[in-house]
Amino acid sequence: MIEQFQQVLASVKSVDMSLTKEVQAHLDDLTKPRGSLGRLEEIAMKYVLATGSLRPELRKKKVFCFAADHGVAVEGVSAFPAEVTPQMVYNMLAGGAAINVLSRHAGADLDVVDMGVHHDFVEHPSLRICKVRHGSSNMAEGPAMTMDETLQAIMTGVSLAHEARKEGYDLLATGEMGIANTTPATALYASMLDLPVEMITGRGTGIDDAVLQHKISVIKRALDVNSASLSTPLEQLAALGGFEIAGICGLILGAASVGMPVVVDGFISSAGAVAALKLSCRVSDYLFFSHLSNEQGHKAIMNRLGARPILDLDLRLGEGTGAALAMQVVEASVKLYNEMATFSSASVSGKSV
């Protein structure tokens, strides 16, 4: 499996920057003052470069919501019990979660992916059962996942991206569900981006001050316990991550390897994106960070990455909700690029001075 993984990394290519001049010329020729569509023009530029097509298509969109449980939940770092994870998966399969509403509104299909929920689901049209294990191990006592499990989870995400490409999808989005998953995400940020634990540890599902301090201590313990196994991004992901985070990482790598853009959701999904970036910095050309999460630390994380999220709505739900919203902004940007008239083709005078 390591050979397949390395092949995927080798397949991620930087975008062809030689197209920039032609894309910018088209944007400037649209019937509007130059630059007047602001960031929509930047988004259109990035989408065009990611696809490598001067007339890119955006026919079908899909949100992947990766679900998994976490061994560290036994440490009491969340306001909700672990059984909420499968309950929320059932809610999504019934169409009643926020991500169902927002993905429908965005015209995007939704797949829920069981990467490691501590529950056995029956088959469902919207459920992809890709379970690596029934929940990760407690990272405060040792590695959350084995290296083989980590690679399996990553390659599952890669396969889903490649399958989506073959099915005609042009834009993907990440989402997640997993009680206690802000804890491994925070540990990954601390390790991969060298950020202080206290600065980036938030309240997740709404913990009080006492539990917040306990959560910080658990994350520090996990970093200490696993300190000998944090030399590479893959080791960091295995020791401190989770099955859904590794799946998101794989989806991003897989999409980038076939020139497909991905809209990244919030605090948890960004951890999968950071892991992908650490494994291949070239994936940055294919990423749209959807929104600035209200979870503490996300702004510092975005600043460290030099990323500017599309939206800022104080969201902190996860599931892919922010990504589903931002997908619509990306789609609007592409439509403006493709469908607006140009000064060259329309009977509109350009700027006179």
Swiss-Prot record:
Biological pathway: Nucleoside biosynthesis; alpha-ribazole biosynthesis; alpha-ribazole from 5,6-dimethylbenzimidazole: step 1/2
Top-level taxonomic group: Bacteria
Gene Ontology biological-process annotations: cobalamin biosynthetic process
EC numbers: 2.4.2.21
Catalytic machinery residues: E319
One Gene Ontology molecular-function label: nicotinate-nucleotide-dimethylbenzimidazole phosphoribosyltransferase activity
InterPro entries: Nict_dMeBzImd_PRibTrfase, Nict_dMeBzImd_PRibTrfase_bact, Nict_dMeBzImd_PRibTrfase_N, Nict_dMeBzImd_PRibTrfase_sf
Pfam families in the cross-refs: DBI_PRT
Keywords, comma-separated and alphabetical: Cobalamin biosynthesis, Glycosyltransferase, Transferase
Catalytic activity, reaction form: 5,6-dimethylbenzimidazole + nicotinate beta-D-ribonucleotide = alpha-ribazole 5'-phosphate + nicotinate + H(+)
Record has Glycosyltransferase as a keyword: yes
Family: Belongs to the CobT family.
Function: Catalyzes the synthesis of alpha-ribazole-5'-phosphate from nicotinate mononucleotide (NAMN) and 5,6-dimethylbenzimidazole (DMB).
Record's protein name: Nicotinate-nucleotide--dimethylbenzimidazole phosphoribosyltransferase
The organism of origin for this protein: Prosthecochloris aestuarii (strain DSM 271 / SK 413)
Phylogenetic lineage: Bacteria, Pseudomonadati, Chlorobiota, Chlorobiia, Chlorobiales
